[in-house]
């Protein structure tokens, strides 16, 4: 039996999902005053990163992060609700109070931790996908010199690609022709259409596309960095970190990470944020 059968099934955007939060005797662990919507945990996600978060053929949200978000909501006695939105709008939307939690695999940075409470729960690195057969023989980052490379706008991946570009230029090579897209799905569509010669995404997504036979993964394991959940409310972040530590103790967190081939966090979870 997989962890998916043990935890809540994924749901639809802007649709509250039936959950144990509605059962008698389940008292919400977070006050309504700390939430965008009473009794509800509203989460933003960009479901263009299979198998971590994606939309299946029935239009339903699926993936590791959706399963995790649903389980967190369940243990908080709240109803999970998702807002599908591009990553570039997520931090401004959180600060504006449009959702309670960013659940899209946001990379932790010191700059972001100064803006909002964050809980590191996963480690991720970056891959470079290319056309089948790797016709350009890309085997090292310098091979991207002078080539059009697609990436999602506004994320950690774009930042690291631009840092890589500076490193390449400093070596006297031609700059990478960086092309930004609203999300990873459109970036991969551009690679498929020949508009770019490579696409940058997190390791599991590039591996999934390779497994499907769509693209090859030329490079992987670049810039390993913690991935986090991000919240606006300090009380909510404290409640969420308590849930994650409970999941650590009962083994459900480790089971979920291992199901997706991810390395689980071995230590206790903690909140990193302004004044924390």
Residue ranges and their predicted role:
Residues 3, 9-11, 21-70, 74-79, ...:
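N-terminal hydrophobic or amphipathic helices and topogenic motifs
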Residues 66-75, 134-135, 142-143, 147-155, ...:
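Extended ligand-binding regions for polar small-molecule ligands
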Residues 88-92, 105-114, 160-167, 190-223:
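A ligand-binding cleft/hinge motif common to bilobed small-molecule-binding domains
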Residues 47, 123-130, 204-245, 262-276:
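Periplasmic-binding protein-like
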Residues 22-26, 30-31, 156-176, 218, ...:
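Ligand-binding clefts/hinges and TM-proximal coupling segments of bilobed small-molecule sensing domains
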Residues 70, 74, 79-143:
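Acidic, polar ligand-binding/catalytic clefts
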Residues 42-50, 61-74, 106, 127-182, ...:
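Bilobed "Venus flytrap"/periplasmic-binding protein-like clamshell domains
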Residues 42, 78-79, 96-104, 147-148, ...:
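Alpha-to-beta junction loops
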């Amino acid at each position: 039996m997989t962890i998916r059968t043990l935890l809540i099934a994924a749901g639809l955007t802007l649709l509250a999902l039936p959950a144990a939060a509605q059962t008698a005797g389940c008292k919400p662990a977070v006050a309504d005053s700390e939430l965008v919507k009473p009794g509800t945990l509203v989460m933003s996600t960009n479901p263009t990163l299979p198998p971590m978060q994606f939309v299946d053929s029935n239009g339903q949200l699926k993936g590791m992060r959706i399963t995790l978000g649903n389980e967190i909501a369940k243990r908080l006695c709240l109803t999970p609700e998702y807002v599908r939105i591009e990553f570039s709008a997520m931090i401004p939307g959180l600060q504006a109070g449009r959702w309670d939690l960013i659940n899209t695999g946001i990379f932790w940075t010191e700059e972001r931790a100064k803006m909002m409470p964050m809980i590191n729960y996963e480690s991720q690195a970056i891959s470079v996908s290319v056309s089948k057969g790797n016709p350009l023989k890309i085997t090292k980052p310098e091979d991207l010199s002078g080539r059009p490379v697609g990436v999602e706008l506004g994320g950690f991946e774009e930042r690291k690609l631009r840092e890589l570009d500076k490193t390449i230029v400093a070596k006297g090579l031609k700059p990478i022709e960086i092309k930004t897209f609203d999300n990873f799905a459109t970036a991969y569509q551009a690679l498929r259409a020949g508009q770019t010669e490579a696409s940058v995404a997190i390791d599991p997504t590039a591996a999934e596309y390779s497994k499907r036979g769509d693209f090859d993964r030329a490079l992987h394991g670049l810039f390993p960095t913690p991935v986090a959940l991000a919240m606006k409310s300090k009380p909510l972040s404290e409640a969420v970190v308590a849930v994650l530590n409970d999941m650590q103790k009962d083994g459900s967190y480790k089971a979920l990470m291992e199901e997706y081939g991810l390395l689980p966090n071995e230590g206790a979870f903690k909140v990193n944020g302004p004044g924390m």
